[in-house]
């Protein structure tokens, strides 16, 4: 009998082991709730930036409330990941200005992403995406994390169509948005893109100051604004393009204060046509980014919400960022010329009270209303 029992036990063990592994792989623990959508929410609005920067909306994907509502559900739905555990919102959290509070985000299988999650606000006026600016179209960008082998794991995107088609609540949402109830990759991408485009950030203290002649700024914030333009020279990268407001008779408003920045001509000036720069984080760049250790120049909006900072999330505070530019720049062979003096890394020699003033000014660029806006919260309750 023992001769026969052993194979049976081994076979049973293999079956149990296989089923356990299969369950671990698929991880089907989904929320049982369906989305609750408020039809009174209006996402179609005129931005204060329209007329200053052209929106990146393609002609075949006009912004509508129905598309944004569908995109909102997709954005928060973990079904878009292979294991039904990770959604777009897992790495772009409303409480943190639609960025992540981790240096690197956690993917569908527990692995860490290669870079820090960039905030997704005012993307309606952005024309390059990711730290390496690998795409210029938001409709292309939105599906790349879904298919990424670390982030969401749906490497065969065609399976996503069938997966969502099996979810009953999607049928009317797709029909309302596109007049066609069956999910398609094209419509998934368009809806996600429109939800992201609809997320605004235009009510910071700085925004309010534009119409008030900066009379709402305290002395420290005014001093920090002056440092930004002069001694700290921040606006050599976060640059001046549009004359939305005048600081003084000769200095105009750096566009990247207001919007997420775009390619050359819409927000960035750089030796790279994609608005990237090597800022001397390391003597030798382990991540080459756009090439030679260059990374996209990010928006300065909502900095008080979006820590940690840099492409790898290495700095936990704004003070650490300022200390880097003040005296921590490494002499990388590809170091941007704007960060050098006499062919050596710059030393700004900022005093402690100047650093505090610079931080005070940078915080005026944060729109705290975005973390409270119910229109952009999860619809799954």
Each model region followed by its residue ranges:
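Sec-dependent N-terminal signal peptides
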Residues: 6-12
């Amino acid at each position: 009998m023992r001769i026969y029992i052993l194979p049976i036990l081994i076979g049973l063990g293999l079956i149990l082991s296989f089923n356990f592994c299969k369950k671990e792989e698929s991880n089907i623990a989904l929320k049982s709730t369906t989305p609750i959508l408020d039809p009174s929410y209006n996402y179609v609005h005129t931005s204060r930036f329209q007329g200053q920067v052209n929106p990146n909306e393609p002609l075949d994907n006009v912004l509508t409330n129905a598309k944004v509502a569908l995109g909102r559900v997709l954005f928060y739905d973990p079904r878009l990941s292979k294991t039904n555990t990770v959604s777009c919102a897992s790495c772009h959290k409303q409480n943190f200005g639609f960025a992540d509070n981790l240096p690197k985000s956690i993917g569908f299988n527990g692995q860490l992403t290669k870079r820090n999650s960039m905030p997704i606000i005012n993307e309606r006026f952005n024309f390059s995406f990711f730290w390496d600016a690998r795409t210029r179209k938001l409709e292309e960008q939105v599906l790349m994390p879904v298919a990424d082998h670390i982030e969401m794991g749906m490497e065969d995107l065609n399976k996503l169509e069938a997966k969502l088609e099996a979810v009953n609540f999607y049928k009317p949402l797709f029909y309302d948005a596109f007049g066609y109830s069956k999910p398609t990759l094209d419509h998934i991408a368009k809806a996600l893109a429109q939800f992201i485009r609809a997320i605004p950030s235009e009510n910071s203290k700085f925004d309010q100051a534009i119409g008030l002649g900066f009379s709402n700024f305290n002395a420290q914030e005014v001093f920090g604004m002056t440092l930004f333009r002069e001694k700290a020279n921040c606006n050599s990268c976060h640059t001046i393009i549009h004359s939305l407001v005048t600081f003084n008779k000769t200095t105009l408003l750096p566009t990247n204060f207001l919007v997420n920045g775009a390619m050359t001509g819409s927000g960035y000036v750089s030796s790279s046509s994609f608005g990237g720069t090597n800022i001397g984080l390391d003597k030798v760049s382990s991540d080459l980014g756009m090439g030679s250790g260059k990374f996209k120049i990010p928006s300065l909006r909502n900095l008080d919400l979006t820590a940690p900072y840099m492409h790898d999330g290495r700095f936990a505070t704004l003070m650490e960022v300022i200390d880097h530019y003040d005296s921590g720049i490494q002499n990388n062979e590809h170091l941007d010329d704007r960060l050098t003096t006499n062919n050596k890394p710059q030393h700004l020699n900022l005093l402690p009270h100047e650093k505090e003033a610079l931080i005070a000014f940078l915080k005026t660029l944060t729109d705290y209303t975005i973390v409270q806006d119910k229109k952009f919260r999860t619809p799954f309750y």
